[in-house]
Each structure stands twice: as C-alpha cells, then as structure tokens.
Swiss-Prot record:
InterPro entries: Cyt_c_bgen_Ccs1/CcsB/ResB (IPR023494), ResB-like_domain (IPR007816)
Membrane topology: Multi-pass membrane protein
Similarity field: Belongs to the Ccs1/CcsB family.
Gene assigned in the entry: ccs1
Descriptive protein name: Cytochrome c biogenesis protein Ccs1
Record localization: Plastid, Chloroplast thylakoid membrane
Species whose genome carries this gene: Porphyra purpurea (Red seaweed)
Length: 437
C-alpha cells in the first residue's frame, strides 16, 4: 500500500511538472489573466458600494451577471488585489520558472556541448547538406570565421555555431516577465493613492486615502504646503495649463524640497509622486467698509457647457448680493435678490454699492493633487527594459554547422532554429567560397 502511495505521489509530481512546463498551459493562463484585466478596465475600480448599486443595478440594462451583487461577491470592484487574481499571477510565474528550469536551461546546456560527426550518413538528415570539392578543413574554417562562427575542430571533423544569445534570450524573457509580475504585485499590496484638494497657502498631510494595499505604509513624518496656485489661459480664455507651487516640510517646518508642478510634470519625494490633477475655487475675500476681512464661501455649479462659482454677500439682513465667478481671471459679476445683474467687478478693486464700500481682495483657489506611492515601479521599469531587450535578442538565429573530411571528400550540413531559407543561402555561400579559395 505504501509503495502504491509513493508511486501515486511520484505520478502527481511528474504530472504537475509537465503541466507547469507546458507552453499551452502558460498561454491559457496568460489569456485568463488578460481577460480579467480587461474586466478590471471595463468595470470602475475601488468605488463605493453606492456607485455600483446605481450603475450596475440588478434590474438594470446590464447583462444579468454583471450586477452589483456579483461584482461585490467576486471582487470585480478591486480585481487586481483579489486573492484569485494574485493566485493566477503566482501560478503563471511558477509556470514560467518551471519552464525555464526544465526546458530552457537544459536546452542551453545542450547547445553549448560540442558535438562532432564522424560518418557522412549523419548529414542525410540535414536540409541543404552539400559536398565541397577541392578544399581543406583549414580553408573551410577560415571561411566560417568570416561568417562569425565559433569553430571547434577534432581530427577531421569541425563543429561550429553562432547566435548562442538567441538561445539564452528566452531565459531572460521568462525572468523579465517574472520580475515584471513581482513588481506589479509589490505595487498592488504595498502602494497607495491619495487625493487632496488644498486651498492656496494651506498645509496638508496624507489623509484622503482612496486606494491602498494590505501592506501599505502611509508616511506621516512630513507635511506639504501649497504656496501658490495659478492658471494660464489661452487667448480664447480656455485653460492652457495650471501650476501648483509646493513645499515639502519636515515635522519642524523646515523646507525639504520645493517645486512647481503642472500636468505631466509631478514632484518626486522619497518614493512619493505628487501629480497635478484638478483645481477649484472655494472662496473670495472681501472687506465691507474697512471692517475685518470676510471670506465668502463659493459653491461650484456645473452647467451644460460651463461651470461657475456662486457666493452670497450679505450687507445686512434684507440686502444680499449674489457673486458669480467663471474663472480665476479676476472678473466677477454681481446680481441682486431678483436675479438682475447689477455690475461687473474686478478683483483687487473697491466699489461703492448700496451705500457700502466693498473691497474685493482676492480669490481663494484650491488645487487638486494626487499622491501616489508604488514601490514596484523601479522593478517594473527595469524588468520591462530587459523584457524588450531579451525579446529582440531572441530573434537572433542559433545556427550550427558540421563538417567532416572522409577519403578526401568534404561534407557540410547544419541546422538553425529560425530563418531556414537564409541559413541555407549562407550554407551555400560557405560551400562556394570554400571551394574557390
């Protein structure tokens, strides 16, 4: 009974080894991973449950399986961090590793072995094998050297090869993919993403975390200050670019780094990347009759083709003005309680309105920032570079040529792993040049 169990365990191990080293199995895994990645792209990730209930209702127009209950049940709202997706990545990496150890490395070791032929009958298996007239092994070797072959001679037999990098490259392709997956998983489980809407002149810390991994670390040993926020406009009043002037401070308020960021030009600090993503207007500062400065909050109103910011200026209980801003270009419009336009004002100027002197001091903008940490990025970039390089190198043909001399007759033949027609033409050139020398 024990013997049978041992045989069964051995059979299982061999079955798993063959399965994981099978190219078709790896391709199927890759297609499954790609399919779930597409699902993760189609379905919005890391949203609140209310969002999925509103957009993927059970009785909605979506396919009956694609409803919020199934999305929540199978983790399709956070596909890339689910246990089953990470398991698929692990199995795929294991398959590549087993394939490299059981197939690619032994194949490379076989390619490095010198193999000399002794019998002309061995050349019958080669396509394009030939017989060279009137030459010597020395002359043939000299011709092969001009075609960049590595040559080894044993008696009346020559073995040569070139393009060994083409056999080595698939191992690096597999290793690069494994490193790429490791870097991606590292970013998923230990990275985080935060969003902050910060008024100009204010400090902020990392608080509004919108996504994080199981092992994420949120640093709290620094703060950041938005020194200024400005928007550049085109001649047609459309936005050209918006900028945030940011200082990174330590716990004592000492500036550690200072940078002005804009879209596609983030700030880098200790593994964190701060992106410029959005902007808003939160208030306007005014003075009425030289009293203390008042900060009037503004509410954003989204219109079909535009957006405006609206605030109320209360001069007294019965006299209120509505202030409307369209942008940061220091122009505003005042309306009375009836909705009638009173006048346009310029920020930075004083106006006499309803027996009051109102000074419109400044607009208080806020900048939308996204802060990301992804420890796997260096690994991903490095592995992707090696992946592209090794894939390119893998297209180098690995060619082998054998030559023997038997009774003053010279036989030449060879094999290659790709570009068979080109190799046969090269073999013909070697034969012709060797016989003409």
């Amino acid at each position: 009974m024990q013997i049978n169990l041992k045989f069964k365990k051995k059979d299982v191990r061999w079955y798993l080894l063959r399965l994981f080293s099978n190219l078709q199995f790896s391709i199927i895994l890759l297609l499954v991973i790609a399919s779930f990645s597409v699902i993760g792209t189609i379905i919005e990730q890391n949203k609140d449950l209310d969002f999925y209930q509103a957009h993927y209702s059970v009785s909605g127009e979506h396919f009956i399986i694609l409803n919020w209950k199934n999305i929540e049940l199978f983790g399709l709202n956070h596909v890339y961090t689910t246990w089953w997706f990470l398991t698929l990545l692990f199995i795929f990496s294991l398959s590549l590793l087993v394939c490299s150890l059981s197939r690619q490395i032994p194949s490379l070791q076989n390619a490095r072995r010198w193999c000399f032929y002794k019998n002309p009958n061995q050349f019958k298996k080669f396509t394009g094998s030939q017989e060279i007239q009137k030459t010597t092994l020395h002359l043939v070797a000299s011709c092969l050297q001009k075609f960049n072959y590595h040559i080894f001679q044993q008696g009346n037999s020559i073995y040569c090869y070139k393009g060994l990098l083409g056999r080595l490259a698939p191992i690096f392709v597999h290793a690069s993919i494994i490193l790429l997956l490791i870097g991606s998983v590292l970013g998923l489980v230990s990275g985080f993403s935060a969003q902050e809407m910060v008024p100009s002149g204010e400090l902020f810390r990392l608080q509004n975390i919108i996504a994080s991994g199981q092992f994420s670390y949120i640093p709290q040993d620094f703060s950041a200050r938005v020194n200024n926020f400005i928007i550049e406009y085109n001649q047609d009043n459309s936005i050209s670019q918006f900028f945030s002037d940011i200082s990174i401070l330590d716990t004592e308020g000492t500036e550690l780094k200072h940078s002005t960021i804009h879209v596609n030009s983030p700030l880098q600090f200790k593994g964190l990347t701060i992106y410029q993503t959005d902007w808003d207007i939160i208030a306007i500062r005014i003075k009425i009759n030289n009293t203390d400065t008042l900060q009037i909050p503004l509410k954003k109103v989204v219109l079909p083709n535009n957006k405006i910011w609206v605030g109320l200026i209360a001069q007294d209980q019965d006299n209120q003005l509505a202030l409307v801003l369209q942008d940061l270009q220091k122009q505003a419009t005042l309306y009375n309680k009836s909705g009638e336009k009173i006048m346009s004002v310029t920020i930075g100027e004083k106006y006499f309105i309803d027996n009051n002197i109102i000074a419109f001091l400044s607009i208080v903008p806020s900048t939308g920032l996204q802060i990301k940490s992804d420890p796997g990025i260096p690994i991903v970039y490095t592995s992707f570079f090696f992946l592209i390089t090794s894939v390119s190198v893998s297209y180098i043909s690995y060619s082998q040529i054998w030559i023997i001399e038997k009774k003053h007759r010279f036989y030449i033949g060879g094999v290659t792993n790709r570009a068979q027609l080109t190799f046969e033409e090269e073999l013909l050139k070697i034969s012709n040049r060797s016989s003409k020398i």
